[in-house]
Amino acid sequence: MSNCKVIALTNQKGGVGKTTTAVNLGVSLAQQGKKVLLVDADAQANLTMSLGYPRPDDLPISLATIMQDIIDDNPIDVQNGILHHGEGVDLLPSNIELSGLEVRLINAISRERVLKTCMSEVKKNYDYVLIDCMPSLEMLTINALAAADSVIIPTQPHYLSAKGLELLLRSVSKVRRQINPHLRIDGILMTMVMPRTNISKEVTALVKSVYGQNIKVFDAQIPHSIRAVEATAEGKSIFAYDKNGKVAAAYEQFGKEVADIGEKQRNKNRADRLR
């Protein structure tokens, strides 16, 4: 699918609901009739385990295997590594091998573009590719930003999380300047929100006032809920685990916002090609 959109979900701070967002955004887009590939770009393999693969180190092919073949200039067959989930999304899994690959990338030719080469092999089959990045700004995350069309930043309504946004935005700007000039920021998603608490309200208002002029802050806010954690432990999305709950409703709204951005961008690209 030539109109495939590659989105990196990234935040250098861990524990902001990034992997949960990747799973539920992917399933939400699939429920809208989109073909979706989830890519686990974190050696901790949380996304892989969240989709029902509790022993990722036993998987014969992972993202690390494929990226190593690209570094070694071997033939690659990404399709053989893709797993299919019952809720209509595909997964390119990760495991501990990815941590070793991070080191080997340092000496690789075109080291920032190895993941982009991998994505070029698969994106023709999908409407959306969602890359779940590790909570750092190291070489694998730079690879994800180099491969992506856009970035979504999940963040908690805590002061430290909001403070860390500035560092992340500087890194995105640097990648845009030096490697991927077409990289856009789709928006900031507030996660684990406790609407009744003052701090949630204050930090959300702060993020909107500081960044809202230039960057979209999604209308959807993901509420804090133990149900989301339980769903992950079961290898399911929130839609399969608690479809009538508040978290499912929030992720459904978020999925529609993301699809709307994608559709507007596709229409713009078509119009630009016709000029």
Cite the ranges covered by each PLM segment:
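P-loop NTP-binding core
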Residues: 1-275
